[in-house]
Amino acid sequence: MTRKPTMKTFAFALMAVAGFAVLTVGWDAGVASVSASSDKGRKLHVTKECSNYSGTAGSFCTITSSNLNELKVGSTVFYDQAAGIPAGLLDSNVVLDAGDGNRAVGRCTLELATGLGLCTFSDGTGEFAGFNARVRVTPPDDGENWHWEGTYSFD
């Protein structure tokens, strides 16, 4: 005995095909976004001197070199919170100010005993609009210049 296709069978088949198409398109979009995002990370190398950093809120360091055109020598990094809260750490919001309204906002966490830490930046204004960065902080090997090494991108 042969069954005739019914409207229910046709609707089920149509739903299965549509579902497969949605999954295929979604998969392709996901793959594209992953490969695009991996292309965005560029290397960031920065040095800064911190003779004006006292550990109090509002202290700052000055950029002495950078491979990023937007981050000019003489730009300042302001630390909003005091060091030592919590004990043994600097954990502070930061503003990277390159002048003329070009600023990036982020956060730095640093172990005071070793000088090792991490800074992340999530956006900005002016030339730093859409700026994202993740940098490893290392203490001065020359007694003066702190180092940021990591990656950056612009949305």
List the predicted regions and their residue ranges.
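A detector of low-complexity, intrinsically disordered, Ser/Thr/Gly/Pro/Ala-rich segments
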Residues: 4-7, 22, 45, 60-62
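Bacterial N-terminal signal peptides that target proteins for export
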Residues: 2-14
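Beta-strand-enriched cores of mature, soluble protein domains
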Residues: 30-155
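Bacterial N-terminal signal peptides
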Residues: 13-26
